[in-house]
A protein has these predicted regions:
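N-terminal/domain-start alpha-helical segments
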Residues: 1-122
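Short acidic-hydrophobic surface loop/beta-edge motif
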Residues: 124-126
């Protein structure tokens, strides 16, 4: 699975990259909104981890632009904005999931696995 991380906080972006690589994901990281939109528009990613508050272009604008372009890559918003209204706005903008900072690594990895199962039409045995 190839994941794009769009996060301007370098320490967090680097930590996410390391964690994801340790879990056998291929990862690209970008730190600015316009770069994130360019990378995400390539269509080569299986998942995008997207911050909302980014320099140059905010994450919601990136998300809405991707959806307008019919790019359906799953997106998990990772953001400090944790009000219910923020979550609703993010999901209504086209996000597949929303995780407020700070978050646990285990929860993030579980959400990635859940989205991966859905996108692969996973049918687990009971």
């Amino acid at each position: 699975m190839r994941i794009l991380v769009i996060e301007d906080e370098a320490a967090l972006a680097d930590a996410l990259e390391e964690i994801l690589k340790q879990n056998n994901y291929m990862v690209d990281v970008v730190y600015r909104g316009p770069d994130g939109l360019d990378y995400a528009s390539s269509g080569i990613y299986d998942l995008i981890l997207l911050d909302i508050m980014l320099p140059g272009m905010d994450g919601l604008t990136i998300l809405k632009t991707l959806r307008q372009r019919q790019i359906s890559t799953p997106v998990i918003l990772l953001t400090a904005k944790s009000e219910v209204s923020d979550i609703i706005t993010g999901l209504d903008a086209g996000s597949d999931d929303y995780l407020a900072k700070p978050f646990s690594t285990g929860e993030l990895l579980a959400r990635i696995r859940a989205l991966s199962r859905r996108s692969n039409n996973y049918t687990g045995e009971l």
